């Protein structure tokens, strides 16, 4: 199903429709402030395994990120951070960053990498954040952007739908997406290291 939602004013009934799909173990494709994402409810292990199969990888090696609503949401899934790190996050989020932290015990074992780390996103996109807020917990997410694919697949929701309609339960048309992924930043011991350059410029917030 292709569902149109306008970011400027997301329709509550449409958001609830998406949340019901997620609660039933469904897989969705949804807009962010960067490329479109492929996601499911963090509490549904079968849905997580399905996404991993779609990507052809094992869940524990998938480098999924958690889409959170705000900073308070983040704190449930990472180990305590220092004040410097918190101040940077407060300035940078919502925004086009994936921050890598040490994972807390609340991270499902299925998603715990050998390094015991987790990637956290608070996208500057009202549709994604409204879904997470209504759901009550994060979305486990991975990008559908593929360097081997024609670039339009990651930006045009109708093309995305045509490609993935038989593999996912719902595609949200939130308008054209970006074709630049998030900037990935590791955050350990108060130090920030750019792992992947992307849309976000962390220097603005340091």
Describe every region a protein language model picked out:
Residues 1-206:
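Active-site-adjacent structural elements in enzyme catalytic cores
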């Amino acid at each position: 199903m292709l569902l149109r939602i306008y970011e400027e004013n997301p329709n509550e009934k449409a958001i609830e429709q998406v949340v019901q799909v997620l609660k039933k173990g469904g897989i969705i494709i949804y807009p962010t402030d960067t490329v479109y994402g492929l996601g499911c409810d963090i509490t549904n292990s079968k849905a997580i395994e399905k996404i991993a199969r779609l990507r052809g990888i094992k869940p524990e090696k998938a480098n999924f990120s958690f889409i959170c609503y705000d900073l308070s949401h983040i704190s449930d899934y990472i180990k305590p951070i220092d004040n410097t790190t918190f101040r940077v996050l407060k300035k940078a989020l919502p925004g086009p960053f994936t921050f890598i932290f040490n994972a807390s015990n609340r991270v499902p074992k299925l998603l715990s990498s050998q390094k015991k780390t987790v990637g956290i996103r608070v996208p500057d996109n009202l549709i994604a954040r409204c879904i997470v807020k209504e759901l009550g917990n994060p979305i486990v997410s991975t990008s559908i952007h593929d360097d081997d694919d024609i670039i339009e697949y990651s930006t045009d929701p109708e093309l995305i739908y045509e490609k993935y309609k038989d593999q996912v339960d719902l595609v949200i048309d939130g308008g054209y997406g970006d074709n630049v992924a998030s900037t990935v930043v590791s955050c350990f011991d108060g130090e920030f290291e750019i792992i992947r350059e992307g849309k976000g410029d962390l220097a603005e917030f340091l």
